[in-house]
Design a protein with these regions (language model features):
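Iron-sulfur (Fe-S) cluster-binding modules
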Residues: 197-200
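Accessory C-terminal segments flanking Radical SAM cores
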Residues: 33, 73-195
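Radical SAM enzyme [4Fe-4S]-AdoMet core and its adjacent flexible, acidic
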Residues: 2-122, 126-127
């Protein structure tokens, strides 16, 4: 079951959780709104409210008979690590560590109906056309995808964050908000220790 989290739906999340359980679903996919396309018509959450929802989702995940997956909220991994007292870089054998690489352009790509390759359906910057250069070469060699896979190239507080290798922030939301997919994720409330730069 898929759910979009925005200001108009956040209050219904406990009811949706109960519905997911009642229906016997095995996975609840919780999408945090990215203000792109028709998503611009909806009001997103502020960072503090999003943080509270992520904490609630993690707490909920410990008591429900189904899995919970977030989309466009990679900071859920940070919240999970902080709540469990785990290290900032989870080992690859850990479920959080294995899923740590899946964000726009890093473990995921979107091919449009015309063959354009994008890091995500929510990040409308093309790396080229798969009809001309091929999917594998564009994914592996384009500057756009290479930059998104290199978490040390992130800017702002995401670049300074000790969780950047397991989180990475929403590159789609950064792009939608700033025009630069390497900028900070404006939905994340976390400020790394010692960071004194600009906040989104």
């Amino acid at each position: 079951i898929n759910t979009t989290v925005c200001e108009s739906t956040v209050g219904t999340l406990p009811e949706v959780r109960d519905l997911v359980a009642d229906l016997g679903a095995v996975l609840w996919s919780v999408f945090f709104l990215v203000p792109i396309g028709r998503g611009q018509l909806l009001e997103g959450l502020d960072p503090d409210r999003a943080e509270a929802v992520l904490e609630w989702l993690h707490e909920t995940s410990e008591t429900v008979p189904f899995g919970i997956k977030t989309t466009e909220a990679p900071s859920y991994r940070r919240v999970a690590l902080q709540r469990t007292g785990s290290a900032t870089d989870a080992p690859e054998s850990d479920a959080i560590g294995r899923r740590g690489g899946i964000i726009a352009g890093d473990g995921f790509a979107f091919v449009s109906h015309t063959g354009e390759l994008y890091p995500s359906g929510f990040l409308p910057r093309s790396a080229g056309n798969v009809r001309d250069a091929g999917l594998v070469s564009l994914y592996r060699e384009s500057e756009l995808f290479e930059s998104l896979r290199d978490r040390d190239r992130l800017k702002g507080k995401c670049g300074a964050c000790e969780f950047r290798h397991v989180c990475g922030g929403s590159r789609s939301r950064a792009f939608a908000s700033t025009g630069d997919p390497l900028e900070s994720d404006p939905l994340c409330a976390y400020v790394p220790a010692g960071y004194d730069g600009a906040l989104p």
